[in-house]
Amino acid sequence: MDYTTQMDAAKKNVTTKEMEVVAEKEQMEISELKMLMAEGKIVIPANKNHKSLSAEGVGQGLKTKINVNLGISKDCQNVDMEMKKVEIAIAMKAEAIMDLSSFGKTEEFRKKLINMSKAMIGTVPIYDAIGFYDKELKDITAEEMIGVVEKQAKEGVDFMTIHAGINRETAETFKRNKRAMNIVSRGGSLLYAWMELNNKENPFYEYYDKILDICEKYDVTISLGDACRPGCIDDSTDASQITELIKLGELTKRAWDRNVQVMVEGPGHMALNEIQSNMIIEKKLCHGAPFYVLGPIVTDIAPGYDHITSAIGGAVAAASGADFLCYVTPAEHLRLPNIEDMKEGIVASKIAAHAADIAKNVKGARDWDNKMAEARQKLDWKAMFDLSIDPEKAIRYRKESTPEDPDTCTMCGKMCSVRNMNKVMAGKDVNILRED
């Protein structure tokens, strides 16, 4: 192998098998794909040890991808349930799965996940450190934190959230600028607490070059975590968020100098009118690196419905330049999602991603909608179900309320506009009260 990472291969004009897979999926010329990868505007997260991976690209000109979060917590330790979620996420064509397990020894679960998943796998190494070393946060050493990164890289993790932007300088900006909700990033809050408790620099920032060594060796894509993402709409686009984003832009260039692929993570909670400008700011400050957003959630008043608040924000964000959406479920802010929550979150995120791809004029994005329009015009119900983003739900709704005329539905019956236009344009009579 005469290259170290996918980015290195692109810079050397070497075509990898992963590039071939992505180019075919995206209907993009290999030459264009390699050019954008060499510039850092597209990443293909593909750890050398993830053998079951079906590669996906994230970035400029590609379809918007979605990520599904899962994993065990101290209060919910049902590994079998989480593996069932993995199977469903893959069946529903999620392109990425993040193991956010935050309790105990997670290695066995993660290895099983990597072995079975054709979706790219992401993690947040700081979550694993406490359980792996069985130590309180303040007692974990910087070397041990870096050790977790290396351990997970060896296991085959494709991308890792590394909160390297929350350094002492960013922390001071945070202290000087009051927020309604402080730091809501789980990984970011842990690292901020570690810095304060130990009066030391963030290990992920101080030893960033060591992390780059690891990521280059295994071709792990760094997902630069936004520790200072807003946790409510009142905190969005503030000094802490932007200070960290500037730092993430600098860290992006350092990674590129080592041929390490980079994504940048973003908000968060944010009012609709701020989303587009935030996408522009990220692309500018982070030099066109792919943007991975959690939501954004556009209002804070909808517990139980945050898959909707997130889909609204995600559609606007992706239409304005975001490349990767982290799904949000109805259980957000309330509890660990169950399987039904997960399904709803995936569907909502996929709708947002697809709507954005239409707006961005991504190649082939409209084809799906055009086929649905054709099926509806023909009143071809089987085709409509087959084309539905959630066929199971569409079929169930149809069966729950059966119309007299099988061509129609119980909303309009024989007043169905499509039915009647088809008839009259074919020179036939339109009978509403009588049998045809």
Curated annotation (Swiss-Prot):
Residues noted as binding substrate in the record, renumbered to the chain: N69, M98, Y127, H163, S185, R186, G187, D226, A227, C228, R229, E265, Y292
Tagged with keyword Zinc: yes
Residues at which [4Fe-4S] cluster binds: C409, C412, C416
Keywords: 4Fe-4S, Iron, Iron-sulfur, Lyase, Metal-binding, S-adenosyl-L-methionine, Thiamine biosynthesis, Zinc
Domain of life: Bacteria
Gene Ontology molecular function, alphabetical: 4 iron, 4 sulfur cluster binding; carbon-carbon lyase activity; zinc ion binding
Pathway terms, separated by semicolons: Cofactor biosynthesis; thiamine diphosphate biosynthesis
PANTHER family recorded: PHOSPHOMETHYLPYRIMIDINE SYNTHASE, CHLOROPLASTIC, THIAMINE BIOSYNTHESIS PROTEIN THIC
Entry's family note: Belongs to the ThiC family.
Official protein name in the record: Phosphomethylpyrimidine synthase
